[in-house]
């Protein structure tokens, strides 16, 4: 979700981001899904002073408690690609990060959402077990 969609209400934002992810993880575990994959964020950390990064870190920790095997957490930086809705601040960030892409280290470089999807698909059909945290740089380099 976005801050705009919940009018800046952090409780509503958390309800969407946290509750939906956790409920899906619980449901998948209950139905004996072999793997669980989800997208978090580069820089996520449950101890962060930034609301968004802290929330993403809390989600990761909670999902790890539920799904401690065959779990894949993808942590891309700013996602590039088309959206149905217009996110002005995000669009500005995409333009700026794309322009300066050659200067940025891979760990924070903007990444195309289609690449993230392809890497997720590749991990979903792998034979890997355990908890895997796939950082932005690893996503970028996955098929190289």
Question: Language-model features: where?
Answer:
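NAD(P)H-binding glycine-rich loop region in Rossmannoid oxidoreductase-like domains
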Residues: 1-23, 27-30, 124
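Oxidoreductase cofactor-interface core, primarily capturing Rossmann-like NAD(P)-dependent enzymes
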Residues: 46-143
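SDR active-site strand-loop-helix element
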Residues: 36-42, 74-76
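Internal, well-ordered alpha-helical scaffold/interface segments
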Residues: 22, 26, 34-37, 57, ...
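A short small-residue
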Residues: 1-5, 38-41, 98
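Short amphipathic alpha-helical segments at helix-loop
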Residues: 5-9, 43-44, 101-104
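A short helix->loop->beta-strand "cap" motif at the edges of active sites that frequently abuts
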Residues: 31-35, 67-69
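Alpha-helix N-cap/loop-to-helix boundary motif
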Residues: 12-20, 43-55
């Amino acid at each position: 979700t976005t801050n705009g969609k919940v009018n800046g209400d952090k409780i509503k934002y958390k309800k969407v981001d946290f509750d939906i992810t956790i409920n899906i993880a619980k449901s998948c575990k209950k139905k004996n899904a072999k793997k669980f994959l989800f997208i978090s964020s580069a820089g996520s950390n449950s101890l962060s002073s930034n609301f968004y990064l802290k929330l993403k870190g809390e989600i990761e920790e909670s999902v790890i408690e539920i799904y401690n095997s065959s779990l894949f957490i993808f942590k891309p930086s700013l996602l590039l690609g088309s959206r149905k809705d217009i996110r002005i601040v995000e669009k500005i960030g995409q333009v700026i990060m794309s322009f300066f892409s050659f200067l940025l280290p891979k760990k924070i470089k903007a990444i195309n959402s289609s690449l993230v999807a392809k890497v997720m698909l590749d991990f979903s059909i792998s034979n890997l077990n355990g908890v895997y945290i796939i950082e932005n740089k690893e996503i970028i380099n996955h098929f190289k």
